[in-house]
Amino acid sequence: QEPVAESGLGEDGHPARGGFLPPADNRNRMWAGGRVEFLRPLEAGGEARRVSTIKHIEEKQGRTGALLFVTVQHDYLQDSRLAIREEQDIVYREPTPPKTSSGEPMVAGGWREAVTPTPTLLFRYSAVTFNGHRIHYDWPYVTETEGYAGLVVHGPLIATLNLRAFCRANPDARLRRFAYRGLRPLIAPQPFEVGGRIVAPGKAELWAGDHNGLAQKAEVEFD
């Protein structure tokens, strides 16, 4: 995300709401999922430009209360040509106990990789993505204020590890589209697995989870 001065941050470590993102009262922020479309390669060393827009805002009523869904679109251009289009789904929810199980068991078959999400890994990912959300590194805040059992693994980090596992298992694949959806949080340092399987020519299903079941589902389209 864009760098923001300390004075421009909210209590949770994110940029204060009401600027680019809409105000959302005192609700907690969660990353619900996203989609990435790879249209053409970005040239290393070349100048690129990102254009960000709010594509969709929707209020829903869930089992835990009111939910505000926001979809942000990022277009990455080089030489005035669109190279990558990313959509991020963000949800703001009322403070409620986080889910500990999705009710969906882990999937068998295909490739699998074990992951141990250390606090250092979470901190480094927060740093490289300029993500100040305190649920990823501030133990007192995440456990006492937001009610999680420990540090929360970033949804995009899980997606990144899932995509890396896919590329390792399919080194000749050329990515076209990637989509993922969060089902529940993963808590560090509890180990989890990422994995997947080819379900059709040019298409794979990916997943991530632990002994409590699935935490994220994803799909890849490739050549």
Locate each region found by the language model.
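Surface-exposed loop/turn and secondary-structure junction residues enriched for glycine/proline
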Residues: Q1, G33, L39, G45, ...
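Catalytic strand-loop segment that frames the active site of acyl-thioester-processing enzymes
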Residues: Q1, Q78-D79, I90-V153, C167
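Hydrophobic, proline/glycine-rich low-complexity stretches
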Residues: Q1-E47
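Generic secondary-structure boundary/loop-capping signal
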Residues: E6, R17-G18, N26-N28, G33-R35, ...
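Generic detector of short, locally flexible boundary/turn motifs and exposed helical patches
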Residues: G13-G19, L39-L42, V51, T116-P117, ...
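Intrinsically disordered, low-complexity boundary segments flanking structured domains
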Residues: R17-A24, T100-E104, R164-R168
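HotDog/MaoC-like acyl-thioester-processing domains
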Residues: W31-P117, L186-P189, E193-D223
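Catalytic-pocket segment enriched in acidic/His residues
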Residues: V142-P201, E205-E219
